[in-house]
Amino acid sequence: MQLTPLHIQGGRNLSGEIAIQPSKNAALPIIVASLLSSEPVTLHGVPRLSDVYTILELAHHIGTRHVWTGPNSLTLHTPEILNTDAPYALVSKMRASFIMMGALLARAGEATVSMPGGCAFGYRPVDQHVKAFRALGVHIVEEGGNFEARREGSLNGAFVFELLTVGGTQNAILASVLGDGVVTLENASIDTDVVDLINFLNSLGAQIQGGGTNTLTIRGVRALRGGEYRIIPDRIEAGTFMIAAAATRSRLTLTNVRPDHLRAVSSKLMEMGVDILETEGRLIVDARDRELKPVNVTTQSFPGFPTDVQPQMSALLATVPGTSVVQDPVYPDRLTHVAELHRMGANITVSGYTQVIQGGTLHAAPVKAADLRAGAALFIAALTTEGETVIEGVQYLNRGYERLAERLRSIGANAWQPQPVLASAMD
């Protein structure tokens, strides 16, 4: 069944409250990490997104049984490993699936994993994953588009990441948790999703010290127990709706948020002239009657401005009179939103990973998302325009935003996605 496009009749102010969904980027590695235990694990706050279903399909292939026990609660049980390969058909859909290698190395001692996929914006290598594994005693070779890895004993030693990498840090952690070795990781990522993974593993009996710092020490344990865990809220979705409120010059309350995870986004919006009030688990974003100012933005690893919010910020700045400069050295090719925003009247000039944005008024147009966050930029732009924008490529939005049209309507937007019409059988 082909997905129908998202329609947005723009020009409305947003209002009310929106509950931010659990973090997809935290949920995916935690689902993978659950197979390190042979006992049942129950996760609360699991978003029902296409990427989650993909990782569950991969986990099922490995040997995990799962059951949804509530709207966002999931129980997983992996009593034994049935397969030690991660097939291309699944891994090619999503980059996060590459961390299955670390989990399989820990639990089964070997793994064959295809090169990862995901959103198609540039080359995002896994060389830091591979270098870390080799430094810690894993034998790993690449052959025919697959990485084949095995370990003879427990991982031991130290590794210094050459650059901050969320997935590389997570993969090395997963591979090191079981056994009797001691592993030290330097220049490790302090991203919120890494910290949530560490907290989850420690809740099952892992011994990982240094979460939230750039130095991690992992002492292997014989086995992990089962347990329950609640996943953190999605700071990228929260940032998206904060920017949507600013773009529509609205007042919006976000619930189920961690304000401390959003300081970089909050800081830039306040620099533009948006009022932001933080309370426990809530953020109030107020851009009503504001003459917003242009700003310069450069993406960085957490706690800096997130690359996953760069396209959305670019869409906002395209509506703000004056010159803004947006630079994304984290993922320099994350620019697929630019051509589509041009179709809506945006004035954006690109040089390398730098966008120079001359803000103005956007107009409705048919557009197509080529990746998840480009899709978010397009729906934000559509909310600001007079007229109806039709957004193709909804499958990408479904990777990161649950029930998007319904939730946009709940805060005052005129958004809908027509039901697909099934052709009748021919005689």
Swiss-Prot record:
UniProt xrefs under Gene3D superfamilies: Enolpyruvate transferase domain
Active site per the UniProt annotation: 119
Main location group: cytoplasm
Catalytic reactions of this protein: phosphoenolpyruvate + UDP-N-acetyl-alpha-D-glucosamine = UDP-N-acetyl-3-O-(1-carboxyvinyl)-alpha-D-glucosamine + phosphate
The organism's taxonomic lineage, starting at the top: Bacteria, Thermotogati, Deinococcota, Deinococci, Deinococcales
Function, in words: Cell wall formation. Adds enolpyruvyl to UDP-N-acetylglucosamine.
A matching Pfam family: EPSP_synthase
Localisation: Cytoplasm
Family: Belongs to the EPSP synthase family. MurA subfamily.
GO molecular function annotation: UDP-N-acetylglucosamine 1-carboxyvinyltransferase activity
Known pathway: Cell wall biogenesis; peptidoglycan biosynthesis
GO (cellular component) term, any one: cytoplasm
Protein's gene: murA
EC number: 2.5.1.7
UniProt-listed SUPFAM superfamilies: EPT/RTPC-like (SSF55205)
InterPro entries, per the entry: Enolpyruvate_Tfrase_dom, Enolpyruvate_Tfrase_sf, MurA_subfamily, RNA3'P_cycl/enolpyr_Trfase_a/b, UDP_GlcNAc_COvinyl_MurA
This protein's UniProt keywords: Cell cycle, Cell division, Cell shape, Cell wall biogenesis/degradation, Cytoplasm, Peptidoglycan synthesis, Pyruvate, Transferase
Protein name: UDP-N-acetylglucosamine 1-carboxyvinyltransferase
Broad EC category: transferase
Binding sites annotated in the UniProt record for UDP-N-acetyl-alpha-D-glucosamine: 95, 124-128, 308, 330
UniProt modified residues of type 2-(S-cysteinyl)pyruvic acid O-phosphothioketal: 119
